[in-house]
Every structure is written in C-alpha cells, then in structure tokens.
Amino acid sequence: MPDDHKPLAGRTMIMSGGSRGIGLEIAERAAEDGANITLIAKTDQPHPTLEGTIHTAGERIEAAGGAVLKFVGDVRDDDAVARAVEQTVERFGGIDMVVNNASAIDRSSTDALSMKMYDLMQDINCRGSFLLSKLCVPALRESARNRRNPHILTLSPPLNLDPRWAGGQLGYTIAKYGMSLTTLGLAEELRADGIGVNSLWPRTTIATAAIRNRPGGAQRFARSRTPRICADAAYLVLTSPGQDTTGNFFIDDDVLAEHGITDLDSYRVTPGDGPLNADMFL
C-alpha cells in the first residue's frame, strides 16, 4: 500500500527531457517520495550554454530519494523511445506516470523561421509527446488495473485562440498547441481506462536557461518564478485521482490555490512584490 504521506513512493515516472529546468524539478519532487524515474534525454556531455547533463540530473534524483534509469536518447527516434519504455518496465515493473517535458522553441516569424527548425519543433514537441504517450498506453492501462493511479502530464498551454499568439510565432504555437491537442484527445480516449491526462503551464516565465540566454534575459530571469512552482503543481496533479482529474489545462498557481497554497513569495527569483513576466499563451 502507498504511504499516505508519500503517495508516489514506489511509483514509476518516465519523462522526456529532464536534464535541467522544469523537468528535473518535477522529477526531483517525485523522487522525494521515493518514486522511480526514467529520464529520456540527449545531453550526455556538458553543453556550452546549458547547465546539467542526464548524469548530473540522475545524481540529483538519487540524492532526493528516487531510483533513476538514465536513457540517453532522442524523442524523435521511435526505436529509442520504444527501448526506453521497455527498459523502464523491465527495471521497475511498470509505468504509472508519463511526463512530456521535452520541447524545442523558436519564436521567429513565419518568413524568418527555417523549415529545419519548424520540423524540429514539430518532431520534439508534438510528435515526441504523442509517441511517448502512445507507447506507454499499455503500461498505463496495466497501472490502472492495479489501481496505481496512472497519469499523463504534458507541459503545454491552454488552447488559447487569441490570434496574437499564432500571429506572433506561428511555428512555435503550432508545435505547442499540438501537444495540447494530444492532451485533449488522449483524455477522452483514455477516460474509460481511468487514466488522468492533463496539461500544465506556468502563469509566469520560469527561471531557466532558456529565459536567461535570450536577449534581455537577465531582467526577465529576475522577474520570473523558480521551476519549483511547476514541480509542486505537477506533484499535486499527479497525486490527484486520475479518473476524476483529466482533460484539464492547468495553470501552476491555480493548482496551488486550489490546494490552499496562496503565499507564492518563496517561488520568486527576486523577493518582494515587484512585477513578474507573464508567460505566453495566457
């Protein structure tokens, strides 16, 4: 029986990406309960501008209390993702949670966006989320039969049809909304199985390398919240009853508020009550 105080103890999560940033924080939060974590990530060696590798992430997960399977692979590679799923089931006995975290971003206008980058965003964001979710469905159904509360959680925004989001960055919007449509469709398709399928998106920009490395990034970084707010919100979603919590597009601070957490000062990069940057698509 699960520990009521550590509901993810012994549960198994498979995540795309996770070498750093929001994904790693989500994995660490689950590891604090004693969860098993598989990371599918490409960063095997240190990157010149991005901190962390799959190996340093694995060390942090183990230090937090979790068991980790580090799978160096690309979510664009069907065979590699299939092997990661198979090895996860072999190592940990099943899969209870899928977190679609891997994402590529280029906010260029249509005329400036190369088709190579367009394809990369489609392949990682939309197709990668569909592929990992699809390959995990049999294991998630087995988890549901065993009453282990399975979930799919995708880091993608609400389907906001305000034209300014498509008009400003069409290629990226298509890729991220493809992830969100995957949530919408799988939630309905898997509803009868009792598998929770949801998306999570931050209210504000999150202090990650992707923010810091952009032009003007230092100021935006200072006006952001830390990745821990997404991790705490993800934890609350993943520990909720999947059969009753599905088809939602959650915003991180809304999730916390629903659980009585309204003092968010600890999540600020810069203490105080100064302005925060709103995230995209809201």
Where are these regions (language model features)?
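Short-chain dehydrogenase/reductase
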Residues: M1-F92, I105-D106
